[in-house]
């Protein structure tokens, strides 16, 4: 009897199909019944390669062998999944298998996986297509009752194959051409490029360029403290005309900012001591829950909440899906569920309401949804039009057991979002109060939750403040207690974290000017939810970016690539427009409006043009600077070029990048002039760990690291501190302490005849310690509160440096700041919020609670018992007033 072979994309789908259709017997990696054989791939099983005669070894990545544009491609099994491919090939070649059913995912990539498997088999058997939008058993049975003819799927297959081949052509040729260019002077400098990778890198580099060019600007705010019968509240002056004449060209302009101190102090003088006239408006508002998770939003949330990388989140979600079977398919870009999924949602809620599920953690929350019948048709949740290959990530009917801590955290995120989406909106009462002093407006805002709605899933209760609570004003009048002028500085744009970079990749279509191309990218962005984590990891592995805590910072290699691409005029490779153009044309192809050959001809021309520009490209010396300091070896002229600072008369050269750090021009000038520079921060070890070092020119005029250990040798030359200013007395032996190389050190602690060991770093945990702070430390035993220490785990913290009784230097942490008095509305919370949203630069007076732990990361210092537990980061910022004027009467002695 003839049978059809069903090929699913992954084993879990094969299991679902077997259960839905019934009657199958399992035989290892496949199922069988009278009319069907059923098995699956494990994602992609094959990858594109050029035919052998077109392929070259890595050492032959020269321009002579480029471009590589084969007339057709071969397929190569992916090593890790080759065994599964052999299983499928054996089943496909069975004589009783007379046709295939493509049950891979309903989309471009699912089509590609199946087409490559069939192409590799070299078999020509009839094909039918199972097209599913839902994995319920009824949906699967309905799908098999209406299988699609293969000819209707050919346009989608063409688009899938074109996407794969064009990515190969651009990526392989671009990478080999840029590698050949960067290796012209010898060596092998692999320089990867790609359709998604390079525009993503451009986003990071352009942000870093903005940060480097940024110049802080001073501005001032005027704050007032008012009192009424019920208590006190604060207000901030604002310009009522701001924004009424259109959007300002100044990106830092805000209604509350004054750009010269004189205006601020004049405003203060006009208002001090005068009464306030109060007007206010209170109105109810609602806030709906966020939509269900797709992979990108889950990765963003997990990165923001727990610091999980995009790759780690994907791995955890995949384990929860495949191993534990407690989440639905995670590699999705949909945030809705199928319209026929209401019954399944009800069953899932019943599972979550069980007290045995996660110790009853979700029981009361799930029961509330069931009791109130909140699951009902709602296009925001159940919408077939918003589903592509897969639906949103939600819990399955399987109760979790034996989850690891990270797995439990991610599962909890998904479950709570799933529950919250069915709850009613949260309800708030928002009050906006304007207090006018001599006509000048001061704004105060308050927000109180009336009904928590979906926020009750996250532990919020009615009556709690959500921002500031404003005390009541009964007669429309307020006493002005004080007026403060506060000074701030604008801050540069924040570097991307994985969470914000994922958002930028998802919304990259907004960067495209062409309307049709922007529309083509509107749903996809750069990459797909399943590939974005790999793109970020690829940039890390290729040394294009580094992780600094949660920040992603482009390396000199990234800037070098962008500089070259811009110089060669290959701007399309570095912008999202290439992806937009491809998506637009591939969608036309899916609709049968664009022939495959026409698209590939365009890609071939693009590839040839790209290689030609790189091959013939030259970066003239006029694009770089000539140093003013002569060559230390021959006194010749030292000229900067693409990779080095090179003497024009001899072989002396300093590489522009050392230890993953690029020299500044002033640093190279100092190195050549003095033979030493530093200490410099920002170097990285081969393990990616940051370090600081001096850099010296050796006797052979080679730049080398110097970690300041040369004077520890008993046979070393004595150090002459004549002419240097002593910073204070050594806490151990009372000798003089001087600045020396990487340390502040006792004069008796270096050179021959050492009798003391006092030494403390000039740079501690990536923070430079200023001379005046060392003087204060030696004199008083304690520095000022110092900010911007960075632990080895990337945690920023603030601390005092203190001198212990034994002379050793350690950390002491700031006392916990008192909470504001109840009934007094404070602008502190609001200002901290502005610090995140509007670039405010506030002075922090405390540090994260993790600072004590973070301080232990250093070997330079040992922590001293902290003076107090620390305040959390979110409430740490306080502003230092520039000037204070008050008409508050002095208190009488009691």
Task: List the predicted regions and their residue ranges.
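Metal- or metallocofactor-binding catalytic centers and their adjacent structured scaffolds
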Residues: 247-293, 509, 667
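Intrinsically disordered, low-complexity regulatory segments
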Residues: 1-172, 251-252, 492
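Basic, low-complexity terminal or inter-domain segments flanking catalytic cores
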Residues: 2-5, 27, 81, 92, ...
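C-terminal helical "lid" subdomain and adjoining coupling/linker elements of P-loop NTPases
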Residues: 185-188, 192, 204-259, 305
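Conserved short loop/turn motifs at secondary-structure junctions
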Residues: 2-5, 103-106, 187-190, 282-291, ...
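Glycine-centered, phosphate/nucleic-acid-interacting loop/turn motifs that mediate DNA/RNA or nucleotide
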Residues: 324-325, 543
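C-terminal or mid-to-C-terminal helical accessory/interaction module adjacent to the motor/catalytic core
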Residues: 139-224, 283
